[in-house]
């Protein structure tokens, strides 16, 4: 019910732009491609009378305009490299599965091979556009990369990137802050955490120092302290470059860090659509059947609201579960002190190496401070169908719920 059919295909839009001599970078029509032919990707290969030919898809032109070009006419080494790598990758898989008899030297590619190469090229273009879209919409300096070396899955069709909570119709999120601390050198006895009855969450190195279950109160937009205040961490956004990547063990998309992350460092927020608990129960039944887990109850103080990151979210939407995670959830209050609507922040529980996948426990048990009154302040929304866990941890519980 959430999908809306396109009014025109990408190729139709490209052809219209070309006829009207209009450039549109988002659909691949640039001033450069309007003036001259530009190779978008290579589709096929053949040898005729000793000459190698490649079938070329021209940027901004429909596939019906593809032409065979001799190797010496090509001036696209990267695209040729992609073509050869995709071909070798596919043939290698076929040899392993013995599903296709292949030879190292061929005069023409089998249709199934050429079809895979074209799909891979289209996927590469789609993922590149998605990466550019994510980086346009993010509100932090660190980069977001996208990578899929596993299958032909492209960008999610019904996912919209947001940087903060999106209240559902009928829900009003009011930032009730009208005053802030008078500190010029936080923290002091009258700093925001102390005024709320808690200790400062960070040490001098801006690393987390409190136990799980305790809330984080950061300085807000009315405070006198500047942007370098040691109590302004979560509000600055993700400080690390991250990569959304396709996992090779059936867990769909995942997220890995491209930089080393030290212990107790802020990594990212979990954002999504804020809905009522009643609506969460209704949606939960749908998600259960799909095997998805995107609902989080905001039950730090009450059980009135839930965050649904299925359609609206940020990079955290793609973070997988692990029974032995390297991220921990904390409730954060900044410009909104409504205890029913804490912000959800993910902090590292240990040093995470560059290239390592980021995970958190969807049940968030084990490392929680059970002596705290708010130890169960944030928990995944109740689920009715058990989902098998594929985290692979030695301590795996077998199920996500």
Indicate residue ranges for each PLM-predicted region:
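Catalytic cores of histone-lysine modification enzymes
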Residues: 211-214, 221, 232-334, 340, ...
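Eukaryotic short linear interaction motifs
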Residues: 49-52, 62-66, 92, 175, ...
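Cys/His-rich Zn2+-coordinating "finger/knuckle" modules used by eukaryotic regulatory proteins
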Residues: 160-239, 382-401
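Aromatic/acidic cage segments in peptide-binding pockets
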Residues: 1, 34, 57-91, 239, ...
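Long, charged, low-complexity intrinsically disordered regions
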Residues: 1-154, 161-163
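Conserved tryptophan-centered aromatic signature that marks the ligand-binding surface of SH3
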Residues: 36-75, 253-271, 349-363, 367
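Disordered, polybasic Ser/Thr-rich segments at the N-terminal boundary of pleckstrin homology
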Residues: 13-35, 216, 222-246
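Eukaryotic beta-rich interaction modules
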Residues: 20-26, 34-46, 53, 158-167, ...
């Amino acid at each position: 019910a959430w999908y809306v059919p396109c009014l025109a295909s990408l190729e139709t839009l490209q052809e219209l732009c070309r006829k009207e001599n209009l450039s549109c970078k988002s659909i691949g029509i640039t001033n450069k491609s309007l003036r001259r032919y530009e190779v978008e990707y290579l589709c096929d290969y053949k040898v005729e009378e000793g000459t190698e030919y490649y079938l070329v898809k021209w940027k901004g032109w429909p596939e019906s305009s593809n032409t065979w070009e001799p190797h010496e006419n090509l001036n696209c080494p990267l695209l040729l490299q992609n073509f050869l790598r995709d071909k070798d990758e596919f043939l290698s898989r076929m040899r392993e599965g013995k599903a296709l008899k292949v030879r190292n030297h061929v005069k023409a590619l089998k249709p199934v091979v050429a079809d895979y190469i074209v799909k891979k090229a289209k996927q590469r273009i789609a993922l590149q556009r998605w990466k550019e879209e994510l980086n346009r919409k993010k509100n932090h300096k660190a980069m977001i990369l996208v990578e899929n070396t596993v299958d032909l899955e492209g960008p999610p069709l019904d996912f919209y990137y947001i940087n903060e909570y999106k209240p559902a119709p009928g829900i009003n999120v009011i930032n009730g802050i009208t005053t802030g601390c008078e500190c010029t050198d936080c923290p002091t006895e009258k700093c925001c955490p102390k005024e709320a009855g808690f200790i400062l969450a960070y040490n001098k190195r801006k690393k987390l120092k409190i136990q799980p279950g305790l809330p984080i109160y950061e300085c807000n937009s009315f405070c006198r302290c500047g942007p370098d205040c040691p109590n302004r961490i979560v509000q600055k956004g993700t400080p690390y470059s991250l990569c959304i990547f396709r996992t090779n063990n059936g867990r769909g998309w995942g997220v890995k860090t491209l930089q080393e992350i030290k212990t107790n460092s802020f990594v990212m927020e979990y954002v999504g659509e804020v809905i009522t608990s009643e609506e969460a129960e209704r949606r939960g039944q749908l998600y259960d059947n799909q095997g998805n887990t995107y609902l989080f109850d905001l039950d730090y103080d009450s059980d009135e609201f839930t965050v649904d990151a299925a359609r609206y979210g940020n990079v955290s939407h793609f973070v997988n579960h692990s029974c032995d995670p390297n991220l921990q959830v904390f409730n954060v209050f900044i410009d909104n002190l409504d205890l029913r609507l804490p912000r959800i922040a993910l902090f590292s529980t240990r040093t995470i190496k560059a290239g390592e996948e980021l995970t958190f426990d969807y049940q968030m048990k084990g490392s929680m401070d059970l002596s705290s009154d708010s130890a169960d302040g944030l928990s995944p929304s109740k689920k009715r169908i058990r989902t098998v866990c594929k985290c692979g941890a030695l301590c795996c519980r077998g199920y996500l719920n």
